[in-house]
Swiss-Prot record:
N-terminal cap domain: annotated segments: 12-35, 110-158
Reported effect, residue 211 to F: Important increase in activity
Site residues by UniProt (Crucial for binding sphingomyelin and important for inducing hemolysis): 189
Protein residues bound to an N-(acyl)-sphingosylphosphocholine: 187, 229, 235, 284
Main localization category: secreted
Source organism: Eisenia fetida
Protein name as annotated: Lysenin-related protein 1
GO MF annotation terms: toxin activity
Taxon lineage: Eukaryota, Metazoa, Spiralia, Lophotrochozoa, Annelida
Residues at the site labelled Crucial for binding sphingomyelin and inducing hemolysis: 22, 247, 293
Length: 300
């Protein structure tokens, strides 16, 4: 189950079920006749935090929302659980999740007792979160332990807004050059070239023959479907069943804001959309070339 909330900057917040589990984080049996003190060091928050940004990469699927390799951020995690017949709830904010805070505790363990520290761990798309919460239990040595039980575990994650084919307006940005695909007039045809303006919009369509790229900024009415010319230039033509107007994307549906894709032409099957410094334009479809392009949802 999942629910979503549309946010600014091309992202949406989605609530999803995640896996959480109580584990034995630390245990000590004091078989002596006097109390002992033990120092416990723990890390609360994200496990193996190694990114300068909050963007993570899914290493396994998460319902219908995340696929392996998809980028996402964790906004919060909430878990309800039962311990000693009492129901409780605990949550972590984004700041707490990403902090990876190292904490030291000193505990006193009575004689002939066992100390057990239960830790609540969560997994969100392959990212481990340690010590969401902890419960300390002191029992007689050999006595049965009261293991906490997870009732429900949910996370709010930030993912790129879904690109709905035939509907969502997008920008197409060259991943390496960080310039946008724009449309200019060349030889009395609308033609694709890179530029700094982010005002040029496109819509992706799909039919039985492949993906189609429609410009919303043609200067020649009706000439709006991207195709590869025989010389490799990218122009916009009237709609037809010409396979030169069809493209294969490197990423499976659904597409989302921020996805990085390549475009391979369905007529020139060994050629892909790329940057090349031409005489008047610099977006081409060339053999054995498939540059990476970033899809950005236009906020409406």
């Amino acid at each position: 189950m999942s629910s979503s909330t549309v946010m600014a900057d091309g992202f949406e917040e989605i609530e999803v079920d995640v896996v959480s589990v109580w584990k034995e984080g630390y245990a000590y049996e004091n078989r002596g006749n006097s109390s002992v003190q033990q120092k416990i060091t723990m890390t609360k928050g994200m496990k193996n935090l190694n990114s300068e940004t909050k963007t993570l990469t899914a290493t396994h699927t998460l319902g219908r929302t995340l696929k392996v390799g998809d980028p996402f951020e964790i906004a919060s995690v909430e878990v309800s659980y039962t311990f000693s017949h009492q129901k409780s709830q605990v949550s972590m904010t984004q700041t707490e999740v990403y902090s990876s805070q190292v904490i030291e505790h000193t505990v006193t363990i009575p004689p002939n007792k066992k100390f057990t520290r239960w830790k609540l761990n969560a997994d969100v798309g392959g990212t481990g979160i340690e010590y969401m919460y902890l419960i300390d239990e002191v029992t007689a040595i050999g006595a049965d332990l009261t293991i906490p039980e997870v009732n429900k575990s949910r996370a709010k994650i930030l993912v790129g807004r879904q690109i709905h084919l035939g509907e969502t307006e997008i920008r197409i940005k060259h991943a390496e050059r960080k310039e946008y695909m724009t449309v200019i007039s060349r030889k009395s045809w609308p033609a694709a070239t890179l530029g700094n303006s982010n005002l040029f919009k496109f819509v992706l369509f799909e039919d039985s023959s492949g993906i189609r790229i429609k410009t919303l900024n043609t200067m020649y009415p009706g000439y709006e479907w991207a195709y590869s010319s025989d010389q490799g230039g990218i122009y916009f033509d009237e709609s037809s069943d010409n396979p030169k107007q069809r493209w294969a994307l490197s990423k499976a549906m659904p597409l989302r804001h921020g996805d990085v894709v390549t475009f391979r032409n369905n007529f020139f099957t060994n050629s892909g959309m790329c940057y090349d410094d031409g005489p008047a334009t610099n977006v081409y479809c060339l053999e054995k070339r498939e540059d990476k392009w970033i899809l950005e949802v236009v906020n409406t």
